[in-house]
C-alpha cells in the first residue's frame, strides 16, 4: 500500500492557517525506556494522549536532567508525508543527551520513534497549501526516582507532535540585546538543547515583549562583544558586497547548532552566495543589509531593528522598495518549497513517513 493511499487527508474542520501554537489532543505519543543492565533503549511504544507518568523525585524534575529537540513534518501535494532533516536532529539530540549524562538515542531508533509518532497522528499533518506544519517534540529525561545527585537507574525517551503555525510569523520583528542576563557560560552547556538554557530566559523575554520587542538577542557572555544567537533562533547576517551577497553565521561554542541555519548555508552556496562562518563582532551589525532569525519554530524571520540600551544604539534594517527582505524571502521560499514538496529536494533533506506497522507494534492503553 503506497503511503499516500494509507494516510487520511488533513481534517477539514480546522482553520489550518490560524491554529497558532495551542496545545491540543492528538492520537498519542511514543515512549521508549532505557535499560541500564542491557545498556539499550526499548522498542518504541505508542501511548494514548499527551500525559506522562513520572516520579516527583526524578532527576529530570529535581536537577533538570533532560534534553529535547524541535522538528517538523509536512504533507506534499500528492499526500505523502515526510520529516525534514531527521538525521541532523538525531545527531543534535545525541549531543544534548551526552551533555546532561543521558544515554544517547541511536539514530535509527530516534528516526523510527519520530516517524512512528508522525504516522499515528497522520491526520494532524496539515494540507500542503496551508501555512501550518506538524511540530515534533522529542524529549529524553532521567526518570528513575532518587534524591542523590547521581546517574539514575531509569531514563525515558518520548516523541510528541502538535500541529502549529510559525512561532514568530513572517513579518519583521524588532530585537533587544540582553545586557542584564547571560544565556550561557563560556564553558557551559549553551551548545546543547536542554531546558536549563531556556527557562531562565522566560522572564527576560517577557520584559522585552512588554517593551515591544519580539525577540531577545544574546551576546557572548565572556566579552559581550560578539553575537551569539537569539533566545529561540539562530542568527544570520547578510552583507551586500558591491552586488555580491554574503551570509555570515556566528562560530561559537556556546550556541545551538541550528538545523535551519545549516540549511540556509547550503542553499546560499547553491545560489552562488559567499558564506562566512566566524565570530561576528557587535560592531559589524550596521554593515549588514539584513539580519535573520532562523530556527525550526521561527523558520526564517527578518529582523526590523536591533536595540542596545547601554549604548543607546538602534540599528534599523530597512525592507526593499516592495516591502520585502530579498535574501530572507529567497531562503524562506526555497526551504518551504522543499518541505512541502513544491521544489526539488536536491539535498535529500526530506524522509518519507509510512504506515505505523512499518515502525512496529501495537498500541498500548
Swiss-Prot record:
SUPFAM superfamilies for the chain: D-aminoacid aminotransferase-like PLP-dependent enzymes
Stated induction or repression of this protein's expression: Expression is positively regulated by the oxaleimides biosynthesis cluster-specific transcription factor poxB.
CDD domains: BCAT_beta_family
Transmembrane region(s): none
Keywords: Aminotransferase, Pyridoxal phosphate, Transferase
BP GO annotations: branched-chain amino acid metabolic process
GO MF term (any one): branched-chain-amino-acid transaminase activity
InterPro entries reported in the protein's UniProt record: Aminotrans_IV, Aminotransferase-like, B_amino_transII, BCAT-like_C, BCAT-like_N, BCAT_family
Keyword match Transferase: yes
Name of this chain's protein: Aminotransferase poxL
